[in-house]
Structure formats: structure tokens, C-alpha cells
Amino acid sequence: MIKQLTNLRRIGRIKWLSVLLAIAGGLLFVGVSIIPAIAQTQGDLTIDFATTQPGVQSMSGFLYGVEQDEPPDHLIEPLQPRLWRTSRLNLYPRLTGFGATFQLLLSDTWGYGRPRGWPYDDYTRWENHVRNLAREHKGKKMLWDIWNEPDLRDPFWHGTRQQFFETYKRAYRVLREELGPDVIIGGPSITKYDKGFLTAFLNYCRDNNLEVNSLSWHELNDQTINAIAPHIRDANQSFRQNPAYRSLKIQRLDVNEIIGPTAQYRPAENLAYLYYTEQGGASAAAKACWEPKGGGPNNCFNKSLDGLVQPGPFAPRAVWWVYKAYSDGFSTRVRTQGNNPRVIGLASQSNGQNQAQVLFGYFEQGPSARQATVTLTLRNLQQLGLGQPGQPLNLTISRIPDSGEAVVKDLAIVKRQQITVTNQIVRLTVPNIRIHEAYILTIG
């Protein structure tokens, strides 16, 4: 089954990649003759260390990416994963041990056309499969994700939309019967935020007395990253908070695959996905996995943690450092405001080492300058209680390079500075930030 999943996910990702590239190529073709090259851009980030952001949910999460012992724990624990989407039930103890919510990808336990056929070929057989799994794993606390990308005909769904709805209904009723009223069941885990599909799905569920406790979809278009937050807010308003759908008992909005193929190794783009998904108010997210640049097994199945680490020697790549810094700071998030949607930042009162932190970067979205100058305005540093009164604070900026699959064992420090805080505002200008790169400012 795993070999089949590897091949199917490769086919599915290639086909989905071709769609994304066609969209991006069309945009570039239209823009070639009318948009001049942009050499430099400017972005301002204002951080108020006195204004906390309570209730922030971490978007650190993964799709497959590991085996029983690899990658080693010391490369996973610092990332503090909150969601793990997989069909590998034998990994349940390890993944939940990291603090992650286990999301069972039910369709991967069944297969896509072979060897069992499709659920609509024999609904009774599908129900029996779901029932057997539910009984075998009744004691495990997990989210049940019924089917993967039913809007992508090849390879994940060959039936009609109505047949998918029926497939969900059959699985839902079995799970509710076997596991009771508290088990979290969800979907439809479609390839993008398609409001028409979601509306039709939820209307069907409402009309058939079904629940959708976890409403899920994927965000994989690297050219529309900043649309993610509006999508989540729209889903919250249109569905989760809409009295018309109260009977569905929607508890969660899970973007259970984020980050497309072009962005998979780019630090700033990874940060942008985390930023906009968090800002939208999603319950959780999981990093998607794609083909390595040189070919070989999909990053879902080569023990690379979805591409964050090098397989084999198990050493971190640049994007691993983005996830680490993101996870270091999410529990003490403070307000950050910016004036350029491509220049994004997430700030925290503490990174766990008694240092305030700002994680920021400059990512590509349409025609973009190759570099940016970023001005950081730091407010209310005195309220952090760092150091002794009257003593200087140490500011350190480290660069997370756009280095693809290369190993990055340590981050290069690009600036060190001591400041004495004499008022409530400190301004710091960071010039020549390269597109796709991210930076970490620590204050302590």
C-alpha cells in the first residue's frame, strides 16, 4: 500500500503542479511586456511587545514525512508539531508523543482504485473497512479525515461529486455508530478553497443529518499565499459561525496541506504560509510534501520531514530553521503590523531562551523586486524585563538562506548590535534582504 501511495502521490502532485505552473505561467506571460523589473522594495514592520496575541494556534504540522525512528527526535521536538496527517497508524505513539494531534487520512488506508476499487463500487465493503479500523483503534484519540482531494479526478477520485458525498455519509455513520458522539470527523480536504464545493458538501451533510466537525481544504498555490487568511476568515463567517450550519457542529478549520512545490524549500515563502494561515485563525495546518529536486522518493516517504531535513544523515535544511523559530515563539506572540504584504513578520516576547524574537522575511508574490529594505520599529521593549535597568541589550540578526536542499547546520549572524533603551521605541533598518530569505532578530 505504501508503494502505491508513493506512486499515486507523485502522480497527483505532478498533475497538481502542472495546473499551478500553468496558472503562474499565464500570469507571467501577461506581465512580461507591461511590468518593468523592480530592483528594490521597502517594507516596514511595527512590533508592540506589550500587546500580546492570546489564543494563537500553532501552524506547525506535517504530512507523513517520518518512520518509526527517523528522522531522530532531536530534529522533530524543537518544531513542536500540532497536527500530523498520515495513514500510518503504527506511528501513533511516536507522533502523539511530540504533542501532535493525529489526523488519520482514511482514504489512504483504502487506496485509490486499486486493489479494492472505489468506495462507490461496493459501499458495503467500504463500510466494513471503516468499521474494522474504528474497532481496532477505538482507544486512540484522533481526527478522522475521510478522503483526500476528491476534487482532483486523477488520481484521487474517479467518481462524481455526489458519489463522494455518499462515501462521506457512509463513513460518517459507521464512525459515529462505533466511536460515539465525541469523535471528530471531517473533510472534504479539497485541493483549494473552493467555496462552491464546500457549500454543496455542507448542504448535503446538513440535509442528511451528518456533522463536519473538522472543515478542511488545502492551500498550495505559491502565487496566492496572501489569500489564505481571507479564505479562512470567509470559511469561519460563511460556515462555522453561520446559524444555517449549526447542526454540522463545525469545531475546527484545518488547512491540512500548505506550501506548494515552488515554495517548498524557500524560507520566506514557508514563513508566509505559516503567517497567513495563523493570521486567518485556522485551527491547524500541515506542510505538504513534493518531489525532491533531483528525483527519487517523494518527500512524504523519504524520511525528510516533508523536505525540512536531509534524508540519511538527517541534518537540517534552511526551512527547518524557519519552523524552529516559528515554534519557538508562537506561545508568546505579540502584535506585528506591516505595510507590505510580501514583507511579513511574527514577533514574540520570548523564544524560550529569555530572548525576545522577530522572525521576518521577504517572499515572492507576482512581479517582485530582488531585494527589500526592512525597517523594524520595536515598541515597549522596556516591558519585556530583559537584562538589568540601564544595561544595554544585545540585538542579533541571523540569516536563513534560500539554499534549497543544502544542509544548514548553523545560521550565519549578519548583524550584532548593543542598544540602551532610553525610550519606548527602537528603530532598526535591515537593508538588502534577498527575496525568498528569512531572518531572525533576537533581543536579550
Residue ranges and their predicted role:
Residues 1-13:
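N-terminal secretory signal peptides that target proteins for export/translocation
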Residues 19-32:
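Bacterial N-terminal signal peptides
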Residues 40-89:
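Boundary/entry segment of secreted carbohydrate-active catalytic domains
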Residues 62, 81-222:
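Substrate-binding cleft and catalytic face of glycoside hydrolase catalytic domains
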Residues 161-285, 291-292:
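Noncatalytic carbohydrate-binding groove/subsite architecture in carbohydrate-active enzymes
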Residues 261-356, 362, 369:
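Aromatic/acidic polysaccharide-binding cleft in carbohydrate-active enzymes
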Residues 340-393, 398-402:
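Carbohydrate-binding surface patches
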Residues 409-444:
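C-terminal beta-strand-rich structural cap/linker in extracellular carbohydrate-active enzymes
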